[in-house]
């Protein structure tokens, strides 16, 4: 698998949860579109959403054995709380992008702290579902550069 997308807590409720912040597309809508984009350029794409920090960590730990070359993660509420997820990403050494549907810097003060931003290749925040597409384009470019080496 080339690209792994991980989504944190409550993102399974996309489409109905606070549409003013998160839009009306469901997570299935978003991941179906991303799968098509990845497949069109010959990459494999897998996605998981979980409300459990431990399960997200397990997906990260398994990423190396699964041949993952790039991770896209929307840690959701774990953005502001999870040193464990941060450490898991550092442990596997796979490049990643951090994505947020809403602009976390235009929201409550507690949402402005990210445990991922300083170690991510990039942060995409506030562009709604299109932010995932931007992150996938970054992943595609990263993988293509690796293949040229």
Swiss-Prot record:
Alphabetic keyword roster: Amino-acid biosynthesis, Aromatic amino acid biosynthesis, Lyase
Active site, per annotation: 22 (proton acceptor), 100 (proton donor)
Catalytic activity: 3-dehydroquinate = 3-dehydroshikimate + H2O
Binding annotation for substrate: 74, 80, 87, 101-102, 111
GO MF entries: 3-dehydroquinate dehydratase activity
UniProt entry tagged with the keyword S-adenosyl-L-methionine: no
Pathway where it operates: Metabolic intermediate biosynthesis; chorismate biosynthesis; chorismate from D-erythrose 4-phosphate and phosphoenolpyruvate: step 3/7
HAMAP family, alphabetized: AroQ
Subunit (UniProt): Homododecamer.
Protein's job: Catalyzes a trans-dehydration via an enolate intermediate.
UniProt similarity note: Belongs to the type-II 3-dehydroquinase family.
Protein name: 3-dehydroquinate dehydratase
Natural source organism: Vesicomyosocius okutanii subsp. Calyptogena okutanii (strain HA)
């Amino acid at each position: 698998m080339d690209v792994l997308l991980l989504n944190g807590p409550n993102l399974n409720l996309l489409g109905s949860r606070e549409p003013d912040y998160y839009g009306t597309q469901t997570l299935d809508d978003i991941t179906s579109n991303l799968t098509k984009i990845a497949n069109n350029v010959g990459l494999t794409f897998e996605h998981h959403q979980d409300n459990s920090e431990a399960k997200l960590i397990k997906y990260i730990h398994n990423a190396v054995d699964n041949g993952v070359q790039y991770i896209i993660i929307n840690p959701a509420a774990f953005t502001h709380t999870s040193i464990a997820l941060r450490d898991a990403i550092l442990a596997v050494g796979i490049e990643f992008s951090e994505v947020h549907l809403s602009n976390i810097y235009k929201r409550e003060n507690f949402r402005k702290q990210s445990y991922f931003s300083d170690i991510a290749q990039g942060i995409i925040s506030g562009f709604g579902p299109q932010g995932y597409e931007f992150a996938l384009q970054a992943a595609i470019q990263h993988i293509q550069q690796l293949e040229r080496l």
